[in-house]
């Protein structure tokens, strides 16, 4: 169906693309690479490189000097201020670092310079391997109009549309009328949803075109647009392709990326639901033909629009590794970054098409700092608390941030990618929901709750996805948060008082706010009133301590909690766990295990029943040393543990050195505030500690 030989003979224009294969086939071992990127993709590339014994070099802006990718690299170099145009987009600076460090190759990641043909050319001129496609292929696919012409000549299906150079409004109106409404206005040099408008009626075309042109000019410096037929109820299905310099090209099956907001992907899955083997083969063959049409080398993604009648059309080709590549890795059991390194060394592809198989199902959920209730407005701020589900062979947390890091205004607000795999779609989706329940972030708005609602939506569970999924189901997806249950409120009040008990046991401080509370003593019945502010509502909870707390009870306590609605909740065997950041208890006969409850500044946040609730704490109730810290053995600033001088269970004296910590190029001695017993030492030698984290608990 797709004949590359006929294509070359038919049009000499394409011959220059084909010459990228079968040349310079001598294998060139790569021992050091520079990653010209930041965040999670830089960390992702480094992980594979290190596993293969390849040294890594990081570049960073002033805003990223303490970033995870900098600490992961074998070497790191400052390349400029925070603004990307003065750092990560400066090709000459990156080439200079590559030369200084002795890096033989540059991996561009995605974004920034990854699809910049001039940078690929610069690497070649400087004798540095660009881990990506040839510059000719980047140029060919970088223009939406030119790439569609190439696809038409290659026999790849394309959407009816106008891709001409005449940008006059009269011509655009005429072409739109020929195509038929609704139409999609797209920036010729666009990407990431920028410069894209849907126009339903002819009378709205002029406004849509002008708006698209303004956005295209601001984003890409090019105002040209194209007009395409807008397909109703379409799906966004993309094919992962890989090619080497020996003429081999394969596809690694498809990913469904239909669920989007602001024309940007938010959740992806592989394989695509409800796709027949026949259609899968047709789309895979078309993607390979598209790659061969431009002499492609390396990892690439061919994006298609799939209509309700299973006809599909070429949309664009991303000439880089995609954000969502991990789900392809999960279902094929292949490391695509490792494939990139092999191809960059002029090796052949590790596998042939017939050897590649689909195993199970995988989802990726993108966790963003954004507010879904405000049209997904991006946010910034400090990750005051961050805890994730435990990574494994079937669960990946792809991230470039740690607790205490800032989500900056300068870069994309993506915090992480949560990737799960299981034997089939139903099990994988259940796994994703459970993992989202274990993902806890405090300090800024995120889309985690939205992702939970999305993953439990009946239409999504049935695989009935399309690019308009979120607008269509907006009302149910944007439902207001459920009221806080009696159980959750009782757990919140109980956890706050347990932190108080731990505080009293850890340190009897005459200056502590607890010394003025009066009457609250372990093993004595006491009624205490706790006040919270939840948004605009004041919540009053009366808690009666009814026993427990002795050695025989293993630190468990019993409470009777009376809520302001008059309901009485019995909380038994309540105990703090995991560095005092979770609570376990029986509440009215139901057992809650390790419910996250964290204090940051003046707010207690509790994660329970799939919800995140924030309760402001009056100052007379807040435990001293809150922000998730109990007692006074806290890190004075971010740093590294260099020595631990005691063991759990040791008896220590007030002022005795407990551990040494290196921070800001100085060594700090952390001493015991009281005479007592070492109850916990959360950190080991050489571990990195964030600001204001508990280093030890003495009781």
Swiss-Prot record:
Pathway: Amino-acid degradation; L-leucine degradation; (S)-3-hydroxy-3-methylglutaryl-CoA from 3-isovaleryl-CoA: step 2/3. Binds 2 manganese ions per subunit. The keyword Ribosomal protein does not apply. GO terms for cellular component: mitochondrial matrix; mitochondrion. ATP binds at residues 144, 228, 263. The active site is at residue 320. Biotin-attachment subunit of the 3-methylcrotonyl-CoA carboxylase, an enzyme that catalyzes the conversion of 3-methylcrotonyl-CoA to 3-methylglutaconyl-CoA, a critical step for leucine and isovaleric acid catabolism. This is Methylcrotonoyl-CoA carboxylase subunit alpha, mitochondrial. It comes from Dictyostelium discoideum. The gene is mccA.
């Amino acid at each position: 169906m797709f004949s590359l030989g006929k294509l070359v003979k038919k049009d000499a224009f394409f011959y220059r693309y084909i010459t990228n294969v079968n040349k310079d086939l001598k294998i060139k071992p790569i021992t050091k690479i520079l990653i010209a990127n930041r965040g999670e993709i830089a960390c992702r590339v480094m992980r594979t490189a290190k596993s293969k014994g390849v040294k890594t070099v990081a570049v960073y802006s002033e805003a990223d000097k303490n970033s995870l990718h900098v600490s992961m690299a074998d070497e790191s170099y400052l390349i400029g201020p925070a603004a990307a145009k003065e750092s990560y987009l400066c090709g000459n600076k990156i080439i200079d670092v590559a030369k200084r460090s002795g890096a033989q190759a540059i991996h561009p990641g995605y974004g920034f310079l990854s699809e910049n043909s001039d940078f690929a050319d610069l690497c070649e001129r400087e004798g540095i391997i660009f881990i990506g496609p040839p510059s000719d292929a980047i140029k060919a696919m970088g223009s939406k109009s030119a790439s569609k012409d190439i696809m038409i000549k290659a026999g790849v299906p394309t959407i009816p549309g106008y891709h001409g150079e005449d940008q006059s409004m009269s011509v655009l109106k005429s072409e739109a009328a020929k195509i038929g409404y609704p139409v999609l206005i797209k920036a010729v040099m666009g990407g990431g949803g920028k410069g894209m408008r849907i126009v339903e009626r002819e009378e709205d075309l002029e406004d849509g075109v002008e708006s698209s042109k303004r956005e295209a000019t601001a984003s890409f410096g090019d105002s040209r647009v194209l007009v395409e037929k807008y397909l109703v109820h379409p799906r966004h299905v993309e094919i992962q392709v890989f090619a080497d310099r020996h003429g081999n090209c394969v596809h690694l099956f498809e990913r469904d990326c239909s669920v989007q907001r602001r024309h940007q992907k938010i959740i992806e899955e592989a394989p695509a639901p409800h796709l027949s083997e026949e259609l899968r083969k047709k789309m895979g063959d078309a993607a390979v033909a598209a790659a061969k049409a431009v002499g492609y080398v390396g990892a690439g993604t061919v994006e298609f629009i799939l209509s309700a009648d299973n006809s599909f059309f070429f949309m664009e080709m991303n000439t880089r590794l995609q954000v969502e590549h991990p789900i392809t890795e999960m279902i094929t059991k292949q490391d695509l970054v490792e494939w990139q390194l092999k191809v960059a060394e002029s090796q052949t592809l590790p596998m042939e098409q017939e050897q590649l198989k689909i195993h199970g199902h995988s989802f990726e959920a993108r966790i963003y700092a954004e507010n879904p209730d405000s049209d997904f407005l991006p946010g910034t701020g400090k990750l005051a608390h961050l805890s994730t589900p435990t990574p494994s062979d079937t669960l990946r947390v792809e991230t470039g941030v740690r607790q205490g890091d800032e989500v900056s205004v300068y870069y994309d607000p993506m915090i992480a990618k949560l990737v799960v795999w299981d034997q089939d779609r139903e099990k994988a989706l259940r796994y994703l929901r459970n993992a989202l329940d274990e993902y806890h972030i405090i300090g800024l708005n995120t889309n985690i709750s939205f992702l939970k609602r999305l993953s439990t939506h009946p239409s999504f569970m049935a695989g009935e996805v399309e690019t308009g999924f979120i607008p269509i189901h907006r009302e149910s997806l944007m439902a207001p948060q459920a009221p806080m249950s009696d159980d959750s409120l009782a757990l919140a009040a109980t956890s706050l008082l347990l932190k108080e008990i731990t505080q009293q046991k850890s340190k009897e401080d005459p200056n502590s706010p607890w010394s003025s509370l009066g009457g609250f003593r372990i093993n004595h019945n006491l009624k205490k009133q706790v006040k919270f502010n939840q948004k605009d509502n004041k919540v009053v909870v009366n808690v009666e301590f009814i026993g427990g707390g002795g050695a025989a009870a293993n630190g468990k306590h019993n409470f009777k909690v009376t809520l302001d609605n008059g309901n009485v909740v019995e909380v038994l065997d309540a105990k703090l766990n995991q560095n005092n950041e979770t609570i376990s208890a029986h509440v009215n006969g139901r057992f809650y295990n390790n419910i996250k409850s964290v204090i940051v500044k003046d707010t207690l946040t509790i994660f329970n029943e799939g919800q995140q609730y924030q309760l402001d704490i009056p100052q007379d109730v807040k435990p001293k040393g809150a922000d998730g810290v109990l007692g006074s053995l806290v890190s004075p600033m971010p740093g590294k543990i260099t020595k631990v001088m005691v063991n759990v269970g040791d008896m220590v004296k007030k002022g005795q050195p407990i551990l040494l910590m290196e921070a800001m190029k100085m060594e700090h001695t952390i001493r015991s505030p009281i005479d007592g017993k070492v109850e916990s030492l959360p950190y080991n030698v050489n571990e990195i500690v964030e600001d204001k984290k508990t280093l030890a608990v003495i009781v």
